[in-house]
Regions:
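A short acidic, glycine-rich active-site loop
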Residues: 1-2, 37-39, 107-113
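Histidine/acidic residue-rich metal-binding segments in metalloenzymes
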Residues: 1-17
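His/Asp/Glu-enriched, well-ordered alpha-helical/loop segment
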Residues: 12-86
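C-terminal cap of metal-dependent C-N hydrolases
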Residues: 80-143
């Protein structure tokens, strides 16, 4: 808990937020040589929006640390017609059975969160909307090219 408290107390010196998404199954994690990481992509923004709703920081801080700063640090070019829409007031419980990840579990099972991604537009095309993935496999693109 001391480490967690220290992180919250020092948010002002953290340049950016990043997340791992290593969708290993529980069977893989329970092996002699478990792979590192855990599924985190689907829960990152709802967890951060929850923290913002609790007054730990602002939505502008999230934008700065998840979009603006990483873009600057890693020299990521502008992505035309690309954005994420959220419902900051949506409240729900994180449940692995409702997630898209192949691993079937989350370390945040049962956590109550406030804030849900409702739409993702990538290069002008809806790729996620109202809980449904609309993009076909392979629609992603190397943004460094």
């Amino acid at each position: 808990q001391a480490d967690i408290d220290t992180l919250w107390e020092n948010m002002d010196v953290i340049d950016c937020f990043a997340t791992d998404h290593a969708p290993h199954t529980l069977e893989e994690k329970d092996s002699q040589k478990p792979p590192p990481g855990f599924p985190g992509l689907e829960t990152a923004l709802p967890l951060l929006l929850t923290a913002a709703s609790e007054g730990r920081f602002t939505v502008d801080d999230i934008i700065e640390k998840m979009y603006t700063a990483p873009k600057k640090i890693f020299h990521i070019p502008d992505q035309a017609e690309t954005w994420v829409e959220v419902d900051e007031n949506a409240q729900y419980e994180i449940r692995a059975e409702e997630m898209y990840s192949r691993c079937g579990w989350t370390p945040f099972e049962g956590w109550q969160v406030k804030g849900r991604v409702t739409r993702v537009v990538l290069r002008g095309k809806d790729v996620y909307k109202d809980g449904e993935v609309l993009a076909e496999k392979g629609y992603g693109k190397d943004i460094r090219a």
